[in-house]
């Protein structure tokens, strides 16, 4: 049984399932059947995964935005602050984008800004009380 109705002209409906296996092990499956395994004791915690998801969502925008440029590596260093009381939500997130290639820094910065202002759905899921900042670092191809 789906809790939400199927897609309409105003929204896209997404389905998934998470299932506990044993101990701290669980898995998630999306509506396409793709599976992710989790272990909150011996792997990333749900909050760590959430932080990584904002990085991967926005990094995908950067890679797609640079598709006509010469580059061979993109990564994002992530840091976050959390509230000290329950619920221990994120209060601040910083993403430092690294691009190795022959790419103008102002282009990377513009793509990153557009990602967070418009395209990255995960970034927009965060409460407006969370401060999200970002910076960009270029690395020459000779560092390969």
Language-model-derived ranges and their functions:
Residues 2-53, 60-144:
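Extended beta-strand/beta-hairpin segments
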């Amino acid at each position: 049984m789906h809790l939400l109705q199927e897609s309409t002209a105003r929204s896209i409906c997404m389905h998934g399932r998470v299932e506990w296996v044993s101990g701290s092990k669980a898995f998630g499956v999306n509506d396409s059947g793709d599976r992710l395994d989790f272990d909150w004791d011996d792997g990333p915690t749900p909050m760590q995964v959430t932080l990584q998801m904002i990085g991967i969502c926005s990094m995908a925008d950067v890679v797609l935005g640079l598709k006509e440029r010469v580059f061979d590596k993109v990564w994002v260093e992530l840091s976050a602050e959390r509230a000290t009381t329950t619920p221990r939500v994120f209060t601040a997130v910083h993403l430092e984008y690294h691009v190795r290639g022959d790419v103008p820094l102002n282009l990377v910065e513009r793509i990153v800004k557009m990602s967070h202002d418009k395209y990255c759905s995960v970034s927009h899921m965060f409460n407006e009380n969370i401060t999200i900042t970002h910076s960009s670092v270029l690395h020459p191809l000779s560092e390969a």
